[in-house]
Curated annotation (Swiss-Prot):
The keyword Magnesium applies. The lineage of its organism: Bacteria, Bacillati, Bacillota, Bacilli, Bacillales. Belongs to the BioW family. One of its GO terms (molecular function) is magnesium ion binding. InterPro entries: BioW (IPR005499). One of its GO terms (biological process) is biotin biosynthetic process. Keywords: ATP-binding, Biotin biosynthesis, Ligase, Magnesium, Nucleotide-binding. NCBIfam families: PRK01322.1. Pathway: Metabolic intermediate metabolism; pimeloyl-CoA biosynthesis; pimeloyl-CoA from pimelate: step 1/1. This is 6-carboxyhexanoate--CoA ligase. It catalyses: heptanedioate + ATP + CoA = 6-carboxyhexanoyl-CoA + AMP + diphosphate. Catalyzes the transformation of pimelate into pimeloyl-CoA with concomitant hydrolysis of ATP to AMP.
């Protein structure tokens, strides 16, 4: 298999990104798909595009996708409480999401104190080397959800992870999600106002988590997600 990654920006500001793992015969289709995504994104025009292809040499770990749970009455406060994330930590996470700094990866916070535990500053932790092998989905919205579930599954597949909060930085996409090993993948509608680039990915963990091992798992271990 091959890993293919796309990153696009304008004046060093992130515009669009995507990645997957695929067989050789599918590379051309993904290259075209990611090229078109980069040059036709709602976040604006780009002046830089990076497409990177690497052969996957390490053993691939199989993960079962988090179940999708739809409940229009879900609130972030309730979900955080059910997963052991303090209200203070949740609010600290929302501060990162709503500030004007563009983080290119996830931020790891203590689920108890809200203290930032990673030391990657603006870069953040990048979840890479992943692909959704089988997905019961159709349509444009489901394609977006498929990619989000793949990321959420990887992020929540490690001991010590309590939950993850994600808000898209796309201008007109206002649906975020809250995911956890305990509650599955929960979409949160109208999580932000339209027309803003505010967004981000916050991972809430126990302070005793093996942080270096976790970051290595997210960034370097090949991961294939399947439906149960």
């Amino acid at each position: 298999m091959y890993s293919i990654k796309m990153r696009a920006s304008h004046e060093d500001i992130h515009i669009s990104g995507a990645e997957t793992m695929c067989e050789f015969e599918d590379l051309e289709n993904y290259l075209k798909k990611y090229f078109n995504k980069a040059f036709n994104h709602e976040n604006g025009n780009i002046d830089f595009l990076n497409l990177k292809i690497e052969k996957v040499k390490a053993p691939i770990q199989t993960l079962v996708a988090l179940p999708v749970v739809e409940n229009l009455n879900d609130t972030l406060t309730q979900l955080a409480k059910q997963t052991g994330v303090s209200e203070y930590a949740l609010n600290k996470g929302l501060e990162f999401i709503k500030n004007d700094i563009t983080y290119t990866g996830a931020i790891i916070l203590s689920a108890q104190t809200g203290q930032r535990l990673d030391s990657t500053e603006q870069r953040g932790i990048r979840v890479t080397q992943l692909a959704f092998k089988t997905c019961k989905c159709n349509g444009e919205i489901s394609e977006r959800v498929k990619d989000a579930r793949a990321l959420a599954t990887c992020i929540n597949a490690f001991e010590g992870v309590k939950a993850e909060l994600c808000v898209s930085d796309d201008l007109h996409y206002t649906t975020g999600y809250f995911a956890s090993p305990k509650l599955g993948y929960r979409r949160i509608f109208n999580i932000k106002e339209k027309g803003t680039r505010h967004g981000g990915r916050i991972i809430f963990v126990d302070e005793g988590i093996h942080l270096n091992e976790y970051v290595s798992f997210l960034e370097t271990v090949p991961k294939e997600i399947i439906e149960k």
